[in-house]
């Protein structure tokens, strides 16, 4: 007889081979057709809302691994919180104005760009941005990210632009916006001012020069300065000393030079001079003394400043208020001229005299030559240092004094209020709080004007009579209402008379004749107003629960958002902020095209499936920088296989089981009670990890649970009961009851991380109550299933099992047995407690060790010495049962089932229930 036909062999349509690349698009279609996202909101109508507000990616290219990881992490949060019973609306957004897009458009146009009107350029920028919104939307959807993809927020829409202007109006009303001629970061390539958040630091080689300035009242004495920007020497008007530092007058040849005591040795070693110290004095004694400018017929005054350090140079700081923030502040204090003889393209203007028309970087060489001719150059060298570059064109930037609009961070104690709000926010990781606090404490006023056309216009008007430039809340409000209908193109298309209220007049001279100005707002204001445009104005929960972005946003979106929200509402826009690190390659190097180590997330998705990419994201300690490469992804494929096989085992052994077959806890066998208790501990543990955004711990706990506790122990032990015992017997139903609970928990716990695979398993499972697993509720910890005493006993039994497995392996390698079912295991406990425990559970030990017979003896003459027991393995007596493969002395005694053991023959006779 073929006894295989009498076994309860596994059955399922859930295949071992995942075929994710083929299946996932069909799953997306299913979710869309069934409107699953919409139903997650409808089924939780009236429940508390959890709001994760999406930081908008920039719409100027395909998604990269960083943006993919960011969206996947957000999806972990929203799916988990939905299953916890919250109403979780998720509105994705895109940042669509600004220099990067305009730069791409004008670069593509080349010379043609100069022939285009602002409106034509803006139209092309809009088309470009919306094209990439559509591309990125499809890519994000393919990753399995759920949300309101048909109604995203896009910063170029009239409604959104209206709210930008509305927030801006509040800042103007409060007096936080002012116009000033201040040095700002300026990109000569892109020809615009840049904010701090638009600056990147890269290594850059600069000239390094020591220059001497002759004292007017002591012609043989010189003050020595050091600079890495010789091109700024034409704008020098002062030399700054620290009031409390000690300075030395040293004799070099026939001259006397002044340098700081703390930098003398370094200076002497770099210049190779021989010197003799002749005098010592504090910096403040030289305040107000005049020196001769080495290139022009004018003087440079000695001033005092606390920012002078003893790190580099001479302690005598070259000061050009038109080319540096600290220099500028010193210039204001001493009423110095603000010289900035450089135009938008980084070329010297006629104010620079002989240097007119030279680009500043080319001027470095000429200025150095002129200093040498004038006898003022002490030493020329080169230095490689970290230097500010433009985020868009990657070129070096300069500080340049130009008329710009600023937000004062100190007016109305805005900085102080923001610092107070930062303390109220929960930061993950916790060091995020210190980081943003330090940045806010040190940040300068915010340069908000851009000399570009692709952005929200600053509705400032210039009086034709007196040239006064005015930014008035009434004009902003009037323009904002036009924008609501027509968008910000209106500023470029409509006549000035339509753009301002009819009764508006110049506050300085009373004239009613104006012309437009054409600066646009910093794009960080656009995204920084999203809490108002997307959340607060729509009546959604404010402050929102969570912002989750890369840790570069401490100086970007987090900061722009908290400043603008605090200014308008008095509150931070978020309760919690989570940040992730940056993606590196397997060697820890930054990803770059030049290194050839860039990984396209869609390549991973198209080769392996989105669930593999998502599993990789879950595996990372994302709070820090994250490594990825081909080998790391391949490792996730292996892990995925193990998780999938666990699900397959569970599904394939529940094909004939429904909720009605569940046994009450008291009827379960001890091993099943242990497994059910362990399941509760696992649920409790991973739920806590999900709450704390510790997805790598969810991943590690789940992989360990599936591969160690389930596959290697519980599921392995169960095979005999599931396949061999009678279909409806307590032995099988007890096991199936726990498998049902495990499957239910595991599918739900995996659903936020692997939504496609969890859905596939759910659709094949006896659990299915809804159209989708993503409409299910989170598994609850059922305390009544936790018997601590039993769990402790099984902890001891598992240690005994380890001893037995080692002995079985030894017996296998010695050819005593082939399979563990060939074994008769004799056990001598090392103490009475273990002995009593083994006697208590004697009935289940054969299954527990997967052997044919177990004997507990007081003494063994031979055996393997283990941790808790001594184990002797012998070949089991009797014949091998052809149905269950166990050995038994009475196998073959049933005439109707001659090749079976007593247990199997009882099952076949229908007597074992």
Curated annotation (Swiss-Prot):
A motif ('HIGH' region) lies at residues 57-67. Its EC number is 6.1.1.5. Zn(2+) binds at residues 881, 884, 901, 904. It is found in: Cytoplasm. Keywords: Aminoacyl-tRNA synthetase, ATP-binding, Cytoplasm, Ligase, Metal-binding, Nucleotide-binding, Protein biosynthesis, Zinc. ATP binds at residue 593. It comes from the Bacteria. GO terms for cellular component: cytosol. Binds 1 zinc ion per subunit. Catalyzes the attachment of isoleucine to tRNA(Ile). As IleRS can inadvertently accommodate and process structurally similar amino acids such as valine, to avoid such errors it has two additional distinct tRNA(Ile)-dependent editing activities. One activity is designated as 'pretransfer' editing and involves the hydrolysis of activated Val-AMP. The other activity is designated 'posttransfer' editing and involves deacylation of mischarged Val-tRNA(Ile). This is Isoleucine--tRNA ligase. It comes from Fervidobacterium nodosum (strain ATCC 35602 / DSM 5306 / Rt17-B1).
């Amino acid at each position: 007889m073929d006894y295989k036909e009498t076994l309860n062999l596994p059955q399922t349509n859930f295949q071992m081979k995942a075929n994710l690349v083929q299946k996932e698009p069909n799953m997306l279609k299913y979710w869309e057709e069934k409107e699953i996202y919409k139903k997650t909101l409808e089924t939780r109508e009236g429940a508390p809302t959890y709001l994760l507000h999406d930081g908008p990616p920039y719409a100027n290219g395909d998604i990269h691994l960083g943006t993919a990881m960011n969206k996947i992490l957000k999806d972990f949060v929203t799916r988990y919180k939905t299953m916890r019973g919250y109403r979780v609306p998720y509105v994705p957004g895109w940042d669509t104005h600004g220099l990067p897009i305009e730069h791409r458009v004008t670069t593509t146009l080349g010379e043609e760009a100069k022939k285009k009107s602002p409106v034509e350029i803006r139209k092309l920028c809009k088309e470009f941005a919306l094209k990439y919104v559509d591309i990125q939307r499809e890519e994000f959807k393919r990753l399995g990210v759920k949300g309101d993809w048909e109604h995203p927020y896009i910063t170029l829409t009239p409604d959104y632009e209206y709210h930008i202007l509305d927030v801006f109006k509040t800042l103007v009303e409060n007096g936080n916006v002012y116009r000033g001629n201040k040095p700002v970061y300026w990109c000569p390539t892109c020809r615009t001012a840049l904010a701090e958040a638009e600056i990147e630091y890269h290594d850059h080689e600069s000239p390094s020069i020591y220059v001497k300035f002759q004292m007017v009242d002591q012609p043989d004495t010189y003050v020595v300065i050091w600079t890495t920007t010789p091109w700024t020497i034409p704008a020098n008007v002062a030399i700054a000393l620290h009031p409390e530092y000690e300075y030395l007058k040293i004799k070099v040849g026939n001259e006397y030079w002044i340098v700081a005591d703390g930098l003398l040795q370094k200076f002497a070693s770099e210049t190779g001079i021989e010197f003799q110290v002749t005098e010592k004095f504090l910096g403040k004694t030289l305040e107000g003394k005049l020196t001769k400018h080495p290139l022009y017929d004018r003087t440079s005054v000695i001033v005092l400043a606390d920012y002078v350090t003893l790190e580099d140079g001479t302690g005598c700081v070259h000061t050009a208020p038109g080319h540096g923030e600290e220099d500028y502040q010193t210039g204001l204090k001493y009423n110095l001229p603000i010289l900035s003889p450089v135009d938008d393209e980084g070329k010297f203007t006629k104010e620079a005299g002989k240097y007119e028309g030279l680009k500043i970087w080319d001027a470095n060489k000429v200025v150095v030559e002129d200093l040498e001719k004038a006898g003022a150059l002490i030493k020329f060298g080169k230095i490689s240092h970290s230097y500010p570059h433009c985020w868009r064109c990657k070129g070096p930037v300069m500080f340049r004094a130009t008329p710009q609009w600023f937000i004062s961070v100190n007016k109305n104690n805005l900085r102080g209020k923001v610092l107070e709000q930062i303390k109220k926010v929960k930061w993950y990781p916790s060091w995020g709080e210190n980081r943003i606090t330090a940045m806010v404490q040190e940040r300068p006023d915010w340069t908000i004007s851009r000399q570009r056309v692709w952005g929200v216009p600053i509705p400032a008007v210039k009086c034709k009579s007196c040239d006064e430039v005015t930014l008035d809340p009434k004009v902003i409000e009037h323009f904002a209402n036009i924008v609501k209908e027509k968008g910000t193109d209106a500023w470029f298309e409509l006549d000035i008379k339509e753009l301002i209220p009819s009764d508006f007049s110049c506050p300085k001279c009373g004239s009613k004749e104006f012309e437009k100005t054409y600066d646009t707002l910093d794009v960080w204001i656009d995204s920084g107003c999203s809490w108002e445009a997307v959340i607060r104005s729509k009546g959604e929960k404010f402050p929102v629960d969570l912002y989750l972005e890369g840790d570069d946003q401490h100086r970007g979106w987090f900061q722009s958002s908290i400043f603008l929200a605090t200014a308008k509402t008095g509150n931070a826009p978020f309760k919690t902020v989570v940040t992730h690190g940056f993606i590196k390659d397997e060697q820890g190097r930054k990803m770059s095209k030049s290194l050839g180590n860039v990984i396209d997330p869609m390549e991973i998705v198209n080769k392996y499936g989105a669930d593999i990419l998502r599993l990789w994201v879950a595996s990372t300690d994302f709070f820090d920088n994250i490594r990825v490469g081909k080998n790391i992804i391949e490792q996730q494929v292996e892990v995925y296989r193990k998780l999938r096989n666990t699900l397959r085992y569970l599904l394939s052994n529940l094909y004939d089981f429904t909720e009605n077959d569940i046994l009450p806890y008291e009827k379960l066998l001890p091993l099943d009670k242990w497994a059910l208790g362990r399941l509760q501990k696992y649920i409790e543990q991973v739920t806590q990890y999900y709450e704390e955004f510790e997805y790598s711990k969810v991943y590690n706990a789940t992989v360990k649970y599936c591969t160690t506790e389930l596959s290697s122990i519980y599921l392995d032990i169960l095979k005999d009961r599931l396949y061999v015992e009678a279909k409806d017997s307590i032995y099988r139903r007890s096991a199936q009851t726990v498998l049902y609970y495990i499957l239910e928990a595991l599918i739900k716990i995996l659903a936020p991380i692997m939504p496609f695979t969890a859905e596939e398993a759910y659709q094949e499972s006896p659990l299915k109550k809804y159209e989708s697993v993503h409409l299910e509720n989170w598994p609850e910890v059922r305390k009544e299933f936790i018997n601590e005493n039993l769990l402790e006993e099984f902890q001891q039994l598992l240690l005994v099992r380890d001893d037995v497995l080692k002995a079985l392996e030894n017996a296998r390698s010695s050819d005593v047995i082939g399979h563990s079912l060939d074994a008769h295991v004799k056990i001598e406990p090392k103490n009475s407690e273990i002995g009593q425990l083994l006697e208590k559970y004697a009935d289940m030990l054969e299954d527990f060790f997967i052997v044919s017979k177990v004997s507990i003896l007081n003494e063994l003459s031979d055996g393997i010495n283990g941790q808790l027991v001594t184990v002797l393995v012998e070949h089991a007596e009797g014949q091998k049962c052809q149905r269950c493969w166990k050995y038994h002395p009475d196998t073959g005694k049933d005439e109707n089932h001659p090749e079976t053991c007593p247990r199997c023959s009882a099952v076949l006779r229908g007597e074992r229930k």
